[in-house]
Amino acid sequence: MKKTKFSFIYMGLLAVFILVGVGFIFFYDKDGQTAEIDQELINKTPGLATMLSVQDLLQTQLLDEHLVNIEVQQENKKDHVTVELGGNDHATIESLLKDTYNIYTSANTLTDLSALTIIWSGTLKQQNVTLMKVSFTLEQMQQLPSKTFYDIPSLASLYEKNNELNK
């Protein structure tokens, strides 16, 4: 009889422990705490908010596999963002200019930017090379919606393309 009483108490305590553990797992507010930590991290790290905004913008404009690297440099309390993107094997000057135009016209609303540089990397003749490099200041980006993607080479503060592209 003593053995049964001990087993009953032991099983009861075990059941209470399991219920408390499961309840804690299901009802613990992980998302709220994570959001608070993320916001603290964003406030403490200069350029992180801009980098996350640019990353979100790129995810809406391009497929995820295009994004290779994002770097943020502070210039006079504004952020100069350099984005390296991977072009596909069939990239043309026109397709890269169209994608670049779409990114820049969306990025002109990011007020913390001082400049945005986009570097397209890819493979030409079985070698990894820079296909195109384009840089715009925020003021130049704000002029783009009234222009076309063909105007990018003449409007950009920096425009370089690989001479082997489209040969």
What are these regions (language model features)?
Residues 91-114:
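Short, non-transmembrane amphipathic alpha-helical segments
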